[in-house]
Amino acid sequence: MNPPAYTSTSGSVASTGNCAICMSAISGLGKTLPCLHDFCFVCIQTWTSTSAQCPLCRTVVSSILHNITSDANYEEYEVIFDDEGYNEDAPLQIPEEPGVNVSPQPPVHSTANSASNTALMRSHAQPRVLAPDNSSVFQPSTSSHASFSSGFAPYSQTPPVGASNLEATRVSRSAVITPTTSTGPRLHLSPSSRSVSQRLQTLFGITKLPGVPTEPPAYAQAEAHFGQANGYGQHRGALHGSYPAVLTAQDTSQIPTRLPFRATDRDVMEVLNSHVICSLCWVGWDEQLATLFPPPIVEPTKTLILNYIAIYGVEDVKLKVSLRCLLHDLTVPFVENMLFLIDRCTDPTRISMQAWTWHDTPIRLLSGPIKSPDGGSTSQDTSVSNIHRSPPGGSSTQPSSGRRPGRPKGVKRRLFVDDDTGVSTNESVFPVINAPIHHKNSKLAALPTGSTTDSNERLVVESPGASAEQPSTSGSSPSPSRRRGRKQGIARIEMLTKKVRRK
């Protein structure tokens, strides 16, 4: 089995594969111990802030290797949890290795803002031996992590850029740094007057180190050997033990039903074609979301993630920031967050109608032009928009459901003047019926004499006295015979209306 290829860029070793969390090329390599899976360091560091398990194999992650420049020069980010069953007073048990002097240090409690990130990194002068020695590979013991369990982190994480509104939700969490056993310097990060970029640079270890080796490091060989010893291969291009083979978008029918969703849209298929997905990548999505959110909002979370992907695209930086804000904050309002992002989507072509399925149930994503908060649309085509807003300073002219513009709701009262007496009388007049009247053929015989139906099924009532008369010109008063015919026609219409209403 060939190990994955690695290249050296910007002073540190980088992997040529894709990150399983953000589904994009790995930027800033971070490897999890003991399973040795590759991720973006920012992505896996954010992931481990709420869960101690590897997102691929569900192994308890003890630390993350990053800033790897050689076999003997790298930095390690420790994943520390203060969950149930974990003794905070007891130091973390790390297997003793030859040539490493253990010097325990007292715990240090943060005196800065309680919303600080308590990530703990250490630079190894004498790191762990991961190269094969006498046909054996050092495998860190997992007995020290038996008390670890996935759940919420007791400490807060520095929110990503653009997520300052989530800072208030993290104030109630306390920052505690536990002792570590290392001969290298200890680095404690706390918020201060430094800028956000400086804190991120210190937190994520973005440094330029010279002397980068050109050959793959020894831990790549250890990764291949470790995978074979545990019954599964590497993440990309191999099987994961008893799980199904590596699946691509062309073979989505073989994906188990326990997966959170299955993509069926053509655009999504093209995205998945560039990233080979194995079934183990999706194992535990339900369990992971269940540990992050209450059960009633697990399904809305999945739908919201799909909308994020539809709006921003898989390779957009905003998608990563949005997913971090969504998956690592317990009080995020899903609907408001989604509408906030949609209202600020200036490119309506990025949003297309996509169909997703979850347990064979279709989920329709957002589509069409987006209504901005001020009432204007981001696209010229507003036919698919269902948002109706009242004009400022006036009532809305949008008709209600089931009514036509200008159509009265009931019988309209019309004023007629009797030319003989000069007294105005109120007569109930039913408005002109423009819509087709659906009636049974058996009822046609019940129509009054002189009433017919035209080609559009419009009811036409002709009065006997006025049938032979020509229509009067505009401005002339109607004759008495026409007035009598009009009243008779009105009476017949009212009678038909009452019969229809009774039925």
From Swiss-Prot:
Compositionally biased spans, kind Polar residues: 375-388
Reaction equations catalysed: S-ubiquitinyl-[E2 ubiquitin-conjugating enzyme]-L-cysteine + [acceptor protein]-L-lysine = [E2 ubiquitin-conjugating enzyme]-L-cysteine + N(6)-ubiquitinyl-[acceptor protein]-L-lysine
EC numbers: 2.3.2.27
Keyword Zinc-finger: yes
PROSITE patterns: ZF_RING_1, ZF_RING_2
Pfam families membership: zf-C3HC4
Compositionally biased tracts (Basic residues): 404-414
Keywords attached to this entry: Host-virus interaction, Metal-binding, Modulation of host ubiquitin pathway by viral E3 ligase, Modulation of host ubiquitin pathway by virus, Repressor, Transcription, Transcription regulation, Transferase, Ubl conjugation pathway, Zinc, Zinc-finger
Region: Disordered, residue numbers: 175-194, 367-418, 445-503
Low complexity biased stretches: 389-403, 471-480
First and last residues of each zinc finger (RING-type): 19-58
Role of this protein: RING-finger E3 ubiquitin ligase that degrades host SP100, one of the major components of ND10 nuclear bodies, thereby disrupting the organization of these bodies. Also plays a role in the inhibition of host NF-kappa-B pathway by blocking the SCF(BTRC)-mediated addition of ubiquitin chains to host IkappaBalpha/NFKBIA, thereby interfering with its degradation.
Subunit structure: Interacts with host BTRC; this interaction seems to inactivate SCF-mediated protein degradation in general.
Entry protein name: E3 ubiquitin-protein ligase IE61
Species of the source: Cercopithecine herpesvirus 9 (strain DHV)
